[in-house]
């Protein structure tokens, strides 16, 4: 049955949005010809998601309306509130009782940025008594660190439009010895602080997927899954990653 739905969705994708216009299936995903897309306002997430959203909207013949959330916590809290028609963000932030997610679209490495003058030869060396690890409050990195860190202290700061600079300032002031975040923040933070460096390895991975609100039909789920997979297969995702100059993202 699942394969049949995907085949039907693939056939629909081959027809332009104008051609199948406001069918019940398209209307189920984009009511009234408008596609509201929930995203997180950070380059490695929203910056890559926007071209994917534009691709999906074009295929559906729908006008895209970005719904940008300022931080991961606000994005998480949006589920179940009918604020968007589809969402594109970390899989871990899409509650399974409130949304149905597609396959993964891209993956983001979680990295540590070490403050100048510190010695952390590898990931394992970070979790020691007396070490302070900075991170973004409520982000997937925060979830991983909260679960895995046993001895070090976690110092949380809010996500902001200047988060890489904020992370660098935290390290510069030695309020943190390392900063753990997605690579979209980690590498720019390291570049912003002379003497800072990326600790070899990754302490986790953030998987990004699209999601529909719970309760949409299997056919609508299959259509969205097919559209975002086409965006991945045709290079829309990779071009967005390359255009933003992101490292540790694939």
Which residue stretches match the model-derived regions?
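Bilobed "Venus flytrap"/periplasmic-binding protein-like clamshell domains
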Residues: 36-59, 112-162, 184
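Periplasmic-binding protein-like
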Residues: 32, 106-115, 190-229, 244-250
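A ligand-binding cleft/hinge motif common to bilobed small-molecule-binding domains
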Residues: 73, 88-98, 144-147, 172-204
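N-terminal hydrophobic or amphipathic helices and topogenic motifs
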Residues: 2-65, 74, 233, 238-250
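Extended ligand-binding regions for polar small-molecule ligands
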Residues: 50-59, 124-132, 139-140, 209-250
């Amino acid at each position: 049955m699942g394969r049949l739905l995907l085949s039907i969705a693939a056939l629909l994708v081959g027809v332009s949005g104008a051609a199948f216009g406001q069918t019940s299936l398209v209307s189920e995903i984009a009511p009234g010809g408008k596609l509201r897309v929930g995203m997180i306002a950070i380059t490695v997430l929203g910056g890559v998601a926007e071209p994917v959203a534009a691709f999906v909207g074009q295929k559906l013949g729908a006008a895209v309306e970005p719904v940008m959330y300022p931080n991961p916590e606000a994005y998480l809290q949006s589920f179940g509130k009918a604020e968007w028609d589809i969402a594109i963000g970390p899989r871990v932030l899409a509650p399974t009782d409130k949304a149905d997610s597609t396959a993964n679209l891209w993956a983001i490495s979680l990295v540590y940025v070490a403050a100048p003058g510190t010695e952390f030869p590898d990931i394992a060396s970070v979790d020691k008594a007396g070490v302070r690890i900075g991170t973004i409050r409520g982000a997937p990195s925060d979830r991983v660190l909260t679960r895995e860190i046993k001895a070090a202290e976690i110092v949380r700061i809010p996500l902001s439009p200047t988060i890489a600079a904020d992370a660098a300032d935290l390290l510069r002031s030695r309020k943190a010895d390392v900063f753990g975040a997605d690579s979209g923040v980690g590498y720019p933070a390291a570049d912003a602080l002379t003497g800072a460096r990326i600790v070899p390895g990754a302490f986790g991975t953030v998987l990004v997927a699209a999601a529909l609100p719970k309760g949409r039909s299997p056919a609508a789920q299959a259509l969205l899954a097919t559209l975002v997979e086409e965006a991945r297969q045709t290079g829309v995702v990779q071009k967005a990653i390359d255009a933003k100059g992101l490292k540790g993202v694939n």
